[in-house]
Design a protein with these regions (language model features):
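Signature of N-terminal electron-transfer/Fe-S-associated modules in redox systems
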Residues: 2-217
């Protein structure tokens, strides 16, 4: 038996009759085509989360060791050091470049490694807290000064503090207490060990100048 005809207000009586079965079949077919188009679009979209998607060859030297890597452009230097190279001295504090816990040196300059793209260090020399002691295991003068002056409590910020302090001396910004405070202001210590940090830098600065001056003589 035919389905009852659906009447539409104001319809043209000369048009072919629209029946319920025809309406339902047409609607179902349209929905199926829309779903197929959506699935095809999803299949053709790039997989932005794929580990191999858009990697970039990068070569850098970390603490004297050469590394040839394929990195995603969005990988930070901090994540490369900690998660791929196993160098966990640099800490992820704020991950916004505001605390200094992730400070490392790139070609001798201090940087916030959480804000530095790893691919931007291609061809560079990176030094972390793990790479500043002498070959015979002797601590760097700044490390020893931090120990001698109790310039730490929990120790979480200490690697970044030490790396920033070394750079502060090498930049020539450790000639007065006021200057040290100014140029170390980007490194925060939640434990409040600032007095010890200041004393450590004050003591280590002439030792560093003497040793490094002798090295370059």
């Amino acid at each position: 038996m035919n389905s009852p005809r659906i009447s539409q207000p104001g319809e043209d009586r000369g048009a072919p009759p629209l029946r319920r079965r025809t309406f339902m079949m047409t609607t179902a077919a349209g929905a199926g085509m829309a779903a197929a188009r959506s699935a095809a679009a999803e299949d053709s979209a790039p997989d932005v989360d794929s580990p191999s998607q858009g990697t970039q060859p990068t070569q850098l030297t970390v603490n004297g060791t050469h590394h040839a890597l394929k990195l995603q452009p969005r990988t930070s230097l901090l994540d490369l050091l900690r998660e791929q190279l196993g160098l966990t001295g640099a800490k992820k504090g704020c991950d916004h470049g505001q605390c200094g816990a992730c400070t490392v040196h790139v070609d001798g300059r201090r940087v916030a490694s959480c804000l530095t793209l790893a691919v931007k260090t291609d061809g560079c020399a990176v030094t972390t807290i793990e790479g500043i002691e002498s070959a015979d295991g002797t601590l760097h003068p700044m490390q020893q000064a931090f120990i001698d002056h109790d310039a730490l409590q929990c120790g979480y910020c200490t690697p970044g503090q030490v790396m920033a302090a070394i750079a502060c001396v090498r930049e020539g910004h450790a000639t007065s207490d006021a200057q040290i405070r100014e140029y170390m202001s980007g490194n925060l210590c939640r434990c409040g060990a600032y007095a010890g940090i200041l004393e450590a830098i004050r003591e280590a600065a002439p030792v560093m100048r003497r040793l490094e001056g002798r090295r370059h003589a």
